[in-house]
Amino acid sequence: MGKTLIFIKLSSLNECIKYSTIISKIARELSIHKGNELYIWVSCSEMCQKRTKHLFRELQNALCELYLSSATTNDSSLLSVVPTIVLFEYWSNIQLGSITDSWNSVYYSENAKDQILNIPAKSFQSIGPDVLNEIHNIEHLPKKDESEDSGKEINNMVSAVGGTFDHLHVGHKVLLTLTAWFGVKEVIVGVSGDELLKKKVQKEFLENIQKRKEEVSNFLHSIKEDINCRVVTIHDPFGPTITDAEIDSLIVSEETKTGATAVQEERVKRGLPELSIYCIDLLYPAQELNLKDNNSLKVSSTAIREELAKLAYKNK
């Protein structure tokens, strides 16, 4: 039990696909015992580049690939998913030494060998080029159509996102990381209050509002040291998005994007500037590509609550 580090150095974020199988394998082994944690450190100079819609798509795909691959367990139980944090050198401003004094294990790509020399750990294991070549060939990936404005710079500074954030899982982590990437100046997260959760499935297994807010705040500070964030309780579908003039971007998922139109309309009524809307596709690329060797679980808060309900019934 303890903390495990996967240190990968990439020339491009789209190379994350090469590491899917090895991450799944490591996560599966770690899931056998409770108390393990997994950190994935990505060293990629693309994170130093100016923010564009193209880089947004690259980052989104990389996060989905890494987090979905980590949601692999030995017993196919969502409750066994190993807590995982993806960090980016040149963006997170996190020092590896601040996470732990000694790592249980460090897995590293061959090109990162010089960078892991001073990392204290009980064991080291290289995941070299010949291993990676057997996993995936990046050239075989389907290419996403690039729009004409893919190179357009993103200037948003204050981002907002809303949700239940119950039993914080890998999908939430993708959403929150991207919201943090957009919110250079400030990140505002609206967490649904009890009055918005009356129709939730297995609602008796929902975490309380304080727990959900704490988990969101802790996660945001764990991925970016200098982040400026506000985590607030929302009592209606809008929250601060229709009252705060400084918010300039709204991050939504496929499940919540219908609410973005209502937010825009309400802001116009109140004389507030319209927001940039960014929709996160949490299914790409691991599920979209239907990779045969990717055994990641389909994670959702509802599925976690249903599993907790079954466990509670079994233990009666």
UniProtKB/Swiss-Prot annotation:
**Gene Ontology terms: biological process:** coenzyme A biosynthetic process
GO terms (molecular function) for this protein are:
dephospho-CoA kinase activity
InterPro entries hit by this protein: Cyt_trans-like, Rossmann-like_a/b/a_fold
Q: SUPFAM superfamilies recorded for this chain?
A: Nucleotidylyl transferase (SSF52374)
One GO CC annotation: cytosol
Family per record? To yeast YGR277c.
Q: What protein does this entry describe? A: Uncharacterized protein C1F12.08
Native species: Schizosaccharomyces pombe (strain 972 / ATCC 24843)
